[in-house]
């Protein structure tokens, strides 16, 4: 049988573990919420099918996040190009989709195809860590999303 001191120590240990786990989970949730609120919204002018965003990652920055809304079966193309006047290019692009999937690659056209779900899409633009010299990395990203009527023939079987 455990003594009162041992039972108290076990209860204290369990309480501490529960508290630490709760703090860790809250921290993860807060960081996730913070990441989404710091996304830059990509705006499309009325009647426009594309929007261009430019940016520079400082030497201590690794990535920048953007977001836009689109519908399932809309055809999209996302292209990342160098930004004039910067010695490095942030050329890694990954499109995070509302259904939890993601797709992307390094430089050029990082996504081309029919969007799989309706909702908020998040675009991560990052520097290529294998090809960086720690300088400012610029980028120019064009996001083109065709309207549903123009996407019909391209996404008919999707």
Where do the model's predicted regions map?
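Noncatalytic modules at the cell exterior or secretory-pathway interfaces
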Residues: 76, 115-133
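Extracellular and analogous surface-interaction loops
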Residues: 58, 65-73, 113-118
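C-terminal edge strands of extracellular/lumenal beta-sandwich accessory domains
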Residues: 36-47, 66, 127-158
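Bacterial N-terminal signal peptides that target proteins for export
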Residues: 2-20
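Extracellular beta-rich ligand/substrate-recognition surface
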Residues: 51-62, 101-104
């Amino acid at each position: 049988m455990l003594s009162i001191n041992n039972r108290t120590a076990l209860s204290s240990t369990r309480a501490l573990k529960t508290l630490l786990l709760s703090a860790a989970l809250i921290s993860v949730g807060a960081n996730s919420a913070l990441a989404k609120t710091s996304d830059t919204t990509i705006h499309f002018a009325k009647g426009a099918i594309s929007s261009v965003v430019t940016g520079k990652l400082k030497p201590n920055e690794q990535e920048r996040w953007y977001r836009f809304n689109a519908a399932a079966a809309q055809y999209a193309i996302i292209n990342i190009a160098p930004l004039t006047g910067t010695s490095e290019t942030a050329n890694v692009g990954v499109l995070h989709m509302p259904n939890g999937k993601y797709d992307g690659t390094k430089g050029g056209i990082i996504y081309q195809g029919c969007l799989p779900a309706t909702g908020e899409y998040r675009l991560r633009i990052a520097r290529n860590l294998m090809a960086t010299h720690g300088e400012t990395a610029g980028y120019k990203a064009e996001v083109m999303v065709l309207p549903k009527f123009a996407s019909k023939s391209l996404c008919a079987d999707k």
